[in-house]
Amino acid sequence: MLAQLFFSAAALAGDWQRVFTSATLSVDQRAYPGSALREIRGVARVEASLNALMALLKDAAFNRHWVYRSGGAKILEQNGYRQAYVYGVVDAPWPMQDRDTVVRFDYSQAPDTRVITITITNCPDFLPRDPRYVRVPDFGGHWQLRPLADGWVEVTYQVFGDPGGWIPVWVANYAAVTSVTRTLQALPDVVGRYRDATSVYVLEPGPILGYSAPHRASVAPVFANASRTPFTTDNFNSQDRLNADSQKP
């Protein structure tokens, strides 16, 4: 699969097979029912607050600087803090055509464990297709943030998808593993940008869970880079890529 894609997490069939491991990251794959493509799951341990991780995941403008092969992302529509429709571009390696995606993110947090789940649902018809890109026909998945002791968080990124068009199966599966691995490897290097982030909608683990006291919450902007004007892919490619380039660290 070509980079950045946020694929579907189907809790179905097949034993997980380890394909990568390091001190703080493991990546597994398994067969997906009815498809030759693989479902991928990456699990990383990251030293960060839940607020910092959520701020990073919501920052569409910064997406291309850490999500593997991301060509940029932009919020199309948001419904409060807990839901947003997001457009993204995947920079496919030559000679393959670039892909684009439209997905819906839904956020929830368990009040007892403080575990955060962000589900990703495919919405390919939410935005008219652009002939310059292959619209990804099938993907979805989830992020899960589970607080651990001493300021660490277990970050799970589980995905499945079909990149569309013609791509050899072995290339798609290799790219899917690479995408999840590289994205989770990059995450610890960039989350520090958001160390001071706070939101009334994100609860840090408190004394009831045996952790330190939660951060003092303050109202923070909802999904970053939200558009107040009608979105077109022309506007995205001409302006947002320039904006993203200017924000490189």
For each feature predicted by the language model, list its residue ranges.
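Bacterial N-terminal signal peptides that target proteins for export
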Residues: M1-A3
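Eukaryotic helix-grip
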Residues: L12-P249
